[in-house]
Amino acid sequence: MRNIVVGSRRSKLALTQTKWVINELKQLGAPFTFEVKEIVTKGDRVLDVTLSKVGGKGLFVKEIEHELLAGGIDMAVHSMKDMPAVLPEGLVIGAVSRREDARDVLVSKGNRMLSDLPPGSVIGTSSLRRSAQLLAYRPDLTIKWIRGNIDTRLAKLESEEYDAIVLAAAGLARMGWGDDVISDYLPFDVCVPAVGQGALAVECREDDDELRQWLSRLNDEQTERAVRAERAFLQQMEGGCQVPIAGYAEVKEGTVRLTALVASPDGKEMYKEIVTGADPEAVGRQAAAILSEQGAKALIERVKKELGD
């Protein structure tokens, strides 16, 4: 029986997600044994600065992809939102999991909702996408950067000068947390999620036909179509972690509906559009073209220049 080595980041969430995928493959009857190999990524190592300052793309996946290409592992489980828009040659996404709740959530002291937070409240996030949209909605809030895994951030909320933190609903759900810690679910019109948020990507080598065959059975077609639209938009906009870019698509009766957003880090400049169509990639490209024409592309170039990228 073939042994499949599965690459994963070391965080509790990453390992939980990896074990979930392995379990699903076992349930499907995949004729493999599995072994998890923990890999430390650049994004895990550099914790004292924001992701936008770490720079580059694929901060949480690059080292794992190197292992895949070198044959050190056979597949890898990622949060789809960590995946760069373009994969290295020789690698493919073999499966996209059914999407969990894609929304961002607020966890606050005193269980206050976003609209109830007093002016000047300090919000912890490590994401420019979240901070830009929060500031656009509530310019009177103060953003303070926070890094680390979910456990670390929840501990920092209790012990440090934060009134609330923003996290992904899906990550909390996978860790077994829900309404017991969540104070407010942020609606999409307040905070558009990251591209791929709530879904998992299982990456493998393009030429591994046997593994790909089993991964295809794990694939959720509806989620995959939605994510393809989001990633096509992301690819056209060419933004890494340095620019607030968001995209969320839903598929209903064969039609893809994509909400796409590009903003300035301070939230004062924002471009947002809803595009629908049958072809996911075409919808993503169309959204990018519309926003670019409105001024989003120029904004991205300006932000990159300011950050010295």
From Swiss-Prot:
Reported cofactor(s): dipyrromethane
EC id: 2.5.1.61
Coiled-coil ranges per UniProt: none
Catalytic activity: 4 porphobilinogen + H2O = hydroxymethylbilane + 4 NH4(+)
Keyword Zinc in record: no
Pathway: Porphyrin-containing compound metabolism; protoporphyrin-IX biosynthesis; coproporphyrinogen-III from 5-aminolevulinate: step 2/4
CDD domains found in the cross-reference section: PBP2_EcHMBS_like
Entry-annotated residues carrying S-(dipyrrolylmethanemethyl)cysteine: C241
Biological processes annotated in GO: protoporphyrinogen IX biosynthetic process
Pfam families according to UniProt: Porphobil_deam, Porphobil_deamC
Protein name, entry field: Porphobilinogen deaminase
Origin organism lineage: Bacteria, Bacillati, Bacillota, Bacilli, Bacillales
Encoding gene per record: hemC
